[in-house]
Amino acid sequence: MSLLIIPKEEKKKEEPSEVLIDTSTAEKPEDVAREFIACYLVGYDIIRLRFRQRATEYRAYIKDIIRRKLVGVETIEESATHMATHCLLGHVEFPVKDALTRMHVLAQSMHKDAMMALKNGDFSLAKDVAQRDDEVDRLYFFVIRQLKMAVQNRFMIEEIGLLTSRDCLGYRLIAKSIERIADHAARIGQVTPTLKYPIIDNIIVSISEMSNTSIRVCQEAMKSVYQLNIKQANQAIAKTSKVTKLEKETIEQILLAKLNVRTVIGLRLILESIRRTAEYGADIAEIAINLAKKGKFS
């Protein structure tokens, strides 16, 4: 076994990294967007684009992606055939743990509002919840970018708020789980307007109980991450069985209520999303246990 010591003074201020995307081989704007996001995630500071055809269409699409999906990216140059962007927000200003906390708060708020929209038949609120998913995606991409850069540059580990490089995979999985929780909240928002109201009160009450339990799983899971608390993580995981039990009971209520087919299908999708939310919370709790053990090992 060997020990590698990296002196602090070796750290040097690096020049911004650049990459050029030539759009001439792209068949559609989505192809360019995927390449642009890949460059962002890898950690390039300046991303340049060269347009040869359909420049106006491609430029508008990339600007929309930047606005909706990416944190800290600004356009610094623009012409008829070229465009350059710079990622201005650094890891020191917005550490990974802060970004994860913000993601969790947004995802939890989306879920609660989606349930309120379901309860009240508020289609406007349901639509708003679905649209908020972009904000969670923006933070998710930012976290992945920071973690990828930290793996490549060990000087960044402490700067982004982590202890060791071994934490990077765990936090990446946590970010993905939170992003999926937000996706399921958005799906509830999308499904709600397809339901036929009124819906029997006892069904709404049962769905709400299942939702509240699911949210508690996620809350306790995130607390276990922040505190590296194995006992709390196990408590969160244990609660998922109650969510599964409530789902089965609520499905029975729905089938007995003789609702129209479209509403039955929609409610089943909503129940599935609530259950999946709890399962992603349990995944986060399991990662918290791993991080706690790694912390003791290191």
Regions of interest found by a model, annotated:
Residues 1-298:
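Cytosolic, long alpha-helical scaffolding segments
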